[in-house]
Amino acid sequence: MSDLSHIRNFSIIAHIDHGKSTLADRFIQMCGGLAEREMEAQVLDSMDLERERGITIKAHSVTLYYKAKDGVTYQLNFIDTPGHVDFTYEVSRSLAACEGALLVVDAGQGVEAQSVANCYTAIEQGLEVMPVLNKIDLPQAEPDRVKDEIEKIIGIDATDAVTCSAKTGLGVDEVLERLVATIPAPIGNIEDPLQALIIDSWFDNYLGVVSLVRVRHGRVKKGDKILVKSTGKVHLVDSVGVFNPKHTATADLKAGEVGFIIASIKDIHGAPVGDTLTLSSTPDVPVLPGFKRIQPQVYAGLFPVSSDDFEDFREALQKLTLNDSSLQYTPESSDALGFGFRCGFLGMLHMEIIQERLEREYDLDLITTAPTVIFELVLKTGETIYVDNPSKLPDVSSIEDMREPIVRANILVPQEHLGNVITLCIEKRGVQVDMLFLGNQVQVTYDLPMNEVVLDFFDRLKSTSRGYASLDYHFDRYQSANLVKLDVLINGDKVDALALIVHRDNSHFKGRQLTEKMKELIPRQMFDVAIQAAIGGQIVARTTVKALRKNVLAKCYGGDVSRKKKLLEKQKAGKKRMKQVGNVEIPQEAFLAVLRLE
């Protein structure tokens, strides 16, 4: 389709479970993208993991042809985006390739914090945002209240927002008509030299790197020589095409279109996301503005259970980083766990997903250590360093000041659950910044230590508000705090993988909890196992896993007390000897115990 005015590029913004993948299914069905027998729920969520958890993790793209009521056939390039707070990076990438976005809001639930955050990202990038109310068939749907909320909270006019039900298909054609009318056509020139933005790329064992691109100017076809701007390497194009939703090869990709390019790039860093592609004959085409690199918020050590898997693990991480560029990793070694990698994630869900993808897609067995955030330390020498691993913390005597990262959290919550949410924030050492009453909802803004947020704040928030509160947060600053390193000693030996950095006020409590938890998880040995929590040289908590022992007095019956004493002393000496040479195996659950501290 050569006419730019007949192309519409858009993505869907919505909170988790507001029905964007279902709406995508309806679009595909109405535009005849798949035969009836191939239709299945959530066609675009291709990863098994996405289907099981019912969430979208990766952004997916589809090209559909829609014949509008005015008789014109439009090409719709549609990019499905994730809704979870950990995957905002995927969303900002998808938005960079579009001219417009559909803001899908559940007509029963109303506006949630995550859609607000993504909507602002879209408006900042200059996109046309079109509100759509979904799930209008539900008995609890209140379209008027929700339209009012969209105007109050986000500030876009929603008086004549389209209403539909993606599940039943009601009003979906109306959404498509409105979309074609409101979302602007792309601007670009087919005659100009090629300029294309890489939105996403992944590694295929047969084809090499497959890149999803948005062509801004010019055209690209099979047999062209393309130049990757950041690496300066030239590759020959094997094929170009679009997803509708299957791989479909086309003659070429032109300005304004979204599609894939395969150029048998074998190096996994050969086509980085956010990079610009052009033809090798026009190397001086300006670079397109990419997306801002996102800094990981949470760090954890990942170690293969068997050290023979280390090389496979490294390769798996490299392939995964291509597909998920927000993942960062550096090699690390631990006395307790051997060789592995210190990985940076965007949040806890992201960490779980990555671990599951590594275990499933690459068949690895992994152990994860407790996640931590980055701390800023000012040393007595005046030097500032950043520490993402408690076991790498320098000696306390050399530290002038320890600072922890603070996040600015926006929480949207119905008024009846406000009290519980405030109690939770205070318990997590939060400081209230602002509170706004918007209709039935309240928007509270808190400054919270990131250390408290990353572990279980999201789950606790959902449970105290019966699932109604929603959260969006971003890093704000570093702030001085009274922090200490809590070490765990097992039989007097420090286990580096179990160390934590905690606030001094909580340290005794955390130490007690941790030792109690470890006592349940470490199996009983033939000798007593002492589990201690220490801050520096001071032991703050201790529990003992009692030894298994044989009853050596069973054969004595009424015998003499000195005989009994002799047998008991002999047993004691044996246990003492065992303790000196014995090693304690720590099970994987024990490393994760740190996560489950309330």
Swiss-Prot record:
Extract one GO BP annotation from the record: positive regulation of translation
Give the Enzyme Commission number.
3.6.5.n1
User: Molecular function terms in GO for this entry?
Assistant: GTP binding; GTPase activity; guanosine tetraphosphate binding; ribosome binding; translation elongation factor activity
Q: Which keywords annotate this record?
A: Cell inner membrane, Cell membrane, GTP-binding, Hydrolase, Membrane, Nucleotide-binding, Protein biosynthesis
Q: What class of enzyme is it?
A: hydrolase
Q: Where does GTP bind?
A: D17, H18, G19, K20, S21, T22, N134, K135, I136, D137
Q: Name one GO cellular component term.
A: plasma membrane
CDD domains attached to this UniProt entry: EF4_II (cd03699), EF4_III (cd16260), LepA (cd01890), lepA_C (cd03709)
Please list the residue ranges annotated as the tr-type G domain.
Answer: 5-187
Q: According to Swiss-Prot or TrEMBL, what is its membrane topology?
A: Peripheral membrane protein
Q: Where in the cell is it found?
A: Cell inner membrane
Classify the main location. membrane
Family annotation (Pfam families):
EFG_C, GTP_EFTU, GTP_EFTU_D2, LepA_C
What domain of life is recorded for the organism? Bacteria
The UniProt catalytic activity note for this protein reads: GTP + H2O = GDP + phosphate + H(+)
Report the function annotation for this chain: Required for accurate and efficient protein synthesis under certain stress conditions. May act as a fidelity factor of the translation reaction, by catalyzing a one-codon backward translocation of tRNAs on improperly translocated ribosomes. Back-translocation proceeds from a post-translocation (POST) complex to a pre-translocation (PRE) complex, thus giving elongation factor G a second chance to translocate the tRNAs correctly. Binds to ribosomes in a GTP-dependent manner.
In terms of NCBIfam families, this protein maps to:
lepA, small_GTP
Q: Record's family? A: Belongs to the TRAFAC class translation factor GTPase superfamily. Classic translation factor GTPase family. LepA subfamily.
* Stated name of the protein: Elongation factor 4
